[in-house]
Amino acid sequence: MYNLDTELDIESQEVWERWRTEVDKGQTPQRIDKYLAEHMTGTSRNRIQNAADAGNIWVNGKPVSSNYKVKPFDIIQILLDHEPHDYTIHPEDIPLEIIYEDDDVLVINKPAGMVVHPGHGNYEHTLLNALAWHFRDKLDINDPNIGLVHRIDKDTSGLLLIAKTPEAKTHLGKQFFDHTTERTYNALVWGTFTEDNGTIEGALARDNRDRTIYRVWDMEENPNAKEAITHWRVLERFPYVTLVECRLETGRTHQIRVHMKTIGHPLFADEKYGGMEVLKGLRTQKYKQYIQNCFALCPRQVLHAKTLGFTHPRTGERMHFDSPWAEDMLNLINKWRNYEPNTLGGR
């Protein structure tokens, strides 16, 4: 059984709900929309039918219509877009840094501090308001069949992919579902590593005590926890912090931030996950002031969506994009590159 987490706020929701199951051996023939409605708690049959109409239900790897009759041992996959929002996104003339655009897709470099999606009283100055302006005479960003294919956090900078047609959104959504996209992030984390690379595996769900954050769960303890895998490698070492590259095998909310904290390396300046404290280094007042100056230089989690790779939904061409660090992150990294411990009271 699958239960959608209805408590998720819009900004932290993943764009898609993903579900996969194998039909029991004793299952009698039944329409797939009815079967899924019975097995997916809180999901309407109409929403499931819409997913089928969009080509987002697959049985044994092939798309099926809502009247398909399930059989024992069928492998069912479904990709559900979230329910349409009940408000209108109004155009705002907000500059966008466009990396690539054609008739099917748009790739942008999002600045830190920009909310991706309106919600909870924050209905202006978001990325979708900017997209509504950008598309104003050509596309309606309020159409749920186009738009965001994935999200990044408000205070994370970097690459975002937008679908401009229903066909592109379905095609790209399936790539994210199948983990055939390539995404790497650069992050500055607290502490040093003895290894050069590693993999973190840990299912993620909201923390019961603080619903604004996520934590790693045993999936038997919390059936709503979602599998998450992060591969990391060291890019550059500094005395008390490390620049790492994180490659996502899955794309869960706050995945890198939670996984790095779990292994003892919170992201630098990540207030939500404990990175806004002096966790490593000297006890001198000069060093503490140095860290405070670093926090002031880049007052947000030091995380940047650096690269993005996917197959073009129309041409089949493999696309790859790379974006430069935001200025605040670049200035902070350069500050650590010039770090001189002797001037701060010794090591």
Where is each model-derived feature located?
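RNA pseudouridine synthases
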Residues: M1-R347
